[in-house]
Amino acid sequence: MDLKDVQPYIEDKVCMVTGGGGSIGSEIVRSLSKLNAEKIVIVDIYENGAYSVKCEVGDKVTVEIASVRDYEKMDCIMNKYRPDIVFHAAAHKHVPFMELSPEEAVKNNVKGTEMVADLAEKYNADNFVLISTDKAVEPISVMGASKRCCEMYVYEKSLKSKHTKFSAVRFGNVLNSNGSVIPLFKKQIENGVVTVTDKDVTRFFMTIPQAVELVLMSMTIANGGEIFVFDMGGAVRILDVAEKVIKDGGKVPYKDVKIEFTGLRKGDKLHEKLFFDFEQPQKTRYKKILRVNGSSIENFAEMLDKLYEKAYKNDSDGVREFIMKMTNS
């Protein structure tokens, strides 16, 4: 990753990374340190990951244990540090869990994004970057739908903000991140059976360095309101990934290690998309980074209030039905 274009935007700046103890957030923190950020504030509710990054990176990193769902606490933190740049990576991301607890996807992912974005604007941050996912495109999962709501909220903020530039980045599946398929396959190989949902299921893949490159470099070309996507090439069959991981471990697929097909889970797609049909990807000065204009829906604020009402009543079925309608209209 060539960081020379990014350094002037980061050097001597106060940067905040929500979810900074996670696999993506921690790599953002490491890169910010190399780019000579003045201070890096990790906001994370999970202390172990944040502690590890703090020990590795050193005094430049400050850790605040807090939930992005706690407005008063986040307000205190924002007021204390006055970040120039906010990278919002904190989120619930596991599709099956969010199908079981859709109200938590709304409270954490959507309301959490709203709170952090509002506070970034309140304290005059220069940039706010949302970490989103390709599962937000034509979502069939609650998790994907919640991230689509986040994209729309950030776009709505960009239309009204006088100072802060609001943008988003869409990730594919990030290799070797927490909960991703390759570490799972490696563990399953030890037991002699690897599970794949469907023989034809495909996903777009990117590495952790590519994910961080997208986050940092897109910020240098953001005007506000855009969504940036890394050109990951074609989608890859998960079955091919499983077979390769088995072979790389010195074993023979279907002989030394069985592969079982478990069926798509609720919320799983057979194939993901990087863009909605109405979005028109445009090239940027960075060869591998594409840009689309953000978008929203009519009466978004009113719809969001109705969604929150259902979420805070813990109406799981109501949340699921409403958020799917809201993000596929």
Regions found by a protein language model. Name each.
Residues M1-V14, K39, C76:
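N-terminal hydrophobic signal-anchor/signal peptide
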Residues D5-Y9, K122, V154-S329:
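Strand-loop microenvironment adjacent to phosphate/nucleotide-handling motifs in alpha/beta enzyme folds
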Residues V14-L35:
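N-terminal Rossmann NAD(P)H-binding glycine-rich loop of SDR-like oxidoreductase domains
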Residues D44-G49, G234:
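Helix N-cap at the beta1-alpha1 junction of Rossmann-like dinucleotide-binding domains, i.e.
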Residues V63, L130, A168-R170:
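Conserved beta-strand scaffold in the Rossmann-like NAD(H)/NADP(H)-binding core
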Residues E64-I65, K107, F261:
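Conserved residues in the N-terminal Rossmann fold of short-chain dehydrogenase/reductase
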Residues I65-I85, G267:
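Conserved Rossmann-fold cofactor-binding substructure of NAD(P)-dependent oxidoreductases
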Residues R82, H88, H92-E151, E156, ...:
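Conserved Rossmann-fold NAD(P)-dependent oxidoreductase catalytic core, especially the SDR/UDP-sugar
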